[in-house]
């Protein structure tokens, strides 16, 4: 298993990965196209307990726990060699067919779960942050203050004992405290943390934000990328690349240029990982573009959802096809959208099932927009630091991705950008909030901003988004998957609202305000009724938590609270209902 202490030496495979990334970034500064496609590298975790092998398979298929994540979040009371030896002894004694009671007893004797991740009180937490005074409505101000108290409830730190025996744990040891989403998610997650950090910085928690960034930067140094979350079983995949915008947020609030100077090389490595591991050549109208998709090289079910993945794949007889299926499930998890009809390719478009998942064959709008913004930000960072050669290099990459976004993803007929189907060489003309992501990342010709804003607003209206009082749904297809209708997710609300605002076009800004206020009111209604904030909501029933997926709805909730703060910052005069006068702001 990969060592997880800060001082642990990287494996030969990890060193090779880091060299590849470094070479990709420094080998040729002459052309943005110099970073080519390579075969995605395989898992960094080979643990027989947490990542792959007969022990993991037997426990998870034995249904010792209803939620498979529960098992892989346990730590071992002995070294892995003892854990595995005891398992082999059990298998020998039971003829390779232990029953559920025997497996439960084995887990009880060899694993524990307490005190691995411990509560933490952020020293920079403030009881009455200055931001609260900006919120004009007293009801919303009280709510915002309540959510500020939640930071203390969902703050964690990895226990010191983990660093003493990292091989016994699935948790990845990091030096600084962090914010967990809440509920079953008791480790840090990558893309969640962007919206969490928005909330932290608005409530004055600059040091906590810096610590979270340092944790992520240490992941890039140790593994070459940021895993999906803070567990070794997530080392098979990343998540949407938001580290560079997180640093930009931090710099906006602190002006800490020394932090940027110290870490600019690590930010380059993270972008290099995506540009070298996630790209593919896309040909349209006789021209070839380098574009990104979510893709994972990792066989077998996801450890934390082993049973669900195994059942889905059991009727696939061809081993190569089964591996592809598992990899596309993991790639969908890497996207953050696990799962959604967005990743289905079938004769009926998205109207299939998970058996039709084809994540690697879809060029997602937001991933390419994120990468364009990342390259653009790195160019700006290097300009600020006085590195003109590097600034030009990343500006060229940003220009290359901008051209691809314009030429491949833009749909003139729809007035937005659409995912591209590699298998059938065509746009996927279905509604997803990410269809306006280039407006969110400002990955567009600024001279056309108002045109794009007007067309995006018209597109959203045409697709009936104003009919959903509980938030903008992830799609318009009710599949039962959690990233489909009727679920409305906080980050997608942020993307749509800020996309419309970025256009500076009147109809777009009016719609942005309407959608943001609806979201605030729906969230507040749910909070008033339950005293909880949820990870997702029901677009059809304002304030009701969302459903579907592989686990029950989770409370907390990190990114939900962050988006509330974002919207209250954008619209400080917002009110809980229409009976209270609200000025434009």
Curated annotation (Swiss-Prot):
PROSITE patterns, per the entry: TREHALASE_1 (PS00927), TREHALASE_2 (PS00928)
Any one GO BP annotation for this protein: trehalose catabolic process
Segments traversing the membrane: none
First-tier enzyme category under EC: hydrolase
Entry binding sites for substrate: 184, 191-192, 228, 237-239, 302-304, 336, 550
Organism: Pimpla hypochondriaca
Positions annotated with a glycan in the UniProt record: 207, 348
EC number annotated for this UniProt entry: 3.2.1.28
Superkingdom of this protein's organism: Eukaryota
UniProt catalytic activity: alpha,alpha-trehalose + H2O = alpha-D-glucose + beta-D-glucose
The protein's name: Trehalase
